Amino acid sequence: MQSMNVAQLIEQKICLAIMGPTASGKSGLTMALAKHLPIEIISVDSALIYRGMDIGTAKPTLDEQVAVPHHLIDILDPTESYSAADFVEDVHELVKEIFARGNLPVLAGGTMMYFNALQQGMAKLPSADEAIRAKIHQAWQANPAAVHAQLKQVDPEAAERIHQNDPQRLIRALEVYEMTGKPLTQLQREGQQEGLTEFKLAKVALIPEDRKKLHEQIAVRFHEMLNNGFLKEAEKVFSLDGLSADLPAIRSVGYRQAWLFFAQEYDYDTFVEKSIVATRQLAKRQITWLRKEQDLLVLDPFKTNVDDRVEAVLDYLSALTKNA
């Protein structure tokens, strides 16, 4: 293990990113790194931002949050929305503050859209208009293909990459067009909000070669969540005023299926099966995204132990400071 000079990392404005699919051991690695480095953790997870959603999101425990400073956890109620642009803005401020305290920012999580926004930037788009959104959503519920055809007329590039069964992105693209008179694709080209350009991301990805082991781990973890009271937690969240199935919090994996269970659209066994399948599908999308990433240290969480992974990360960071 090479010696680590944290001051050099701070001077060179290097942030550490711990990326990986769900249930790959990101939190365990990050907490283990805290024994070797003065770190503060910035959550890169679109579900951990919500208060009261703890068990179903595998949120760090209170003890873990006390032991190591965590950010962007429990910042909103489930009835509120939070965009990738909001995330980029918050991370900019947090990274500056963490460096000023003499600590290393560690961005850890699996929301790849957030990581992409940090690296590529985000177009400055108008805030959501609930009336327009509701109108388009109603049309989509009646005929998804017709709404997709409408998008194809005004923004063929967006229609090419957005499936008709992806209501969130489909509705947003049409909403932006109605509000601005310009295609979403054009707006994204015209004005990019800066990503994390003033800082460098040292990227570490936990990618298991053995997909079967990851699938087993996902199933084990979900059953642990159930034993820890996930359904009771979900029922409490769903009792909040102003909650609907269209909100981002309720679209989170596990909560979406629990919502349908409480709506009596799923029986218990179907709820469990659908939740595990949806989590595995999420992991597949995360791995697909990670395999396209460049300049990253790849570690297999099932072929190494956590001490080996910590050593590999420390050596990687040390080499970066020497090569800069």
Curated annotation (Swiss-Prot):
Binding site residues for substrate: 22-27
Site entry: Interaction with substrate tRNA: 111, 133
Enzymatic reactions: adenosine(37) in tRNA + dimethylallyl diphosphate = N(6)-dimethylallyladenosine(37) in tRNA + diphosphate
GO molecular function: ATP binding; tRNA dimethylallyltransferase activity
Biological process, per Gene Ontology: tRNA modification
Keyword terms of this UniProt record: ATP-binding, Magnesium, Nucleotide-binding, Transferase, tRNA processing
UniProt subunit comment: Monomer.
Stated family: Belongs to the IPP transferase family.
The protein's name in its UniProt record: tRNA dimethylallyltransferase
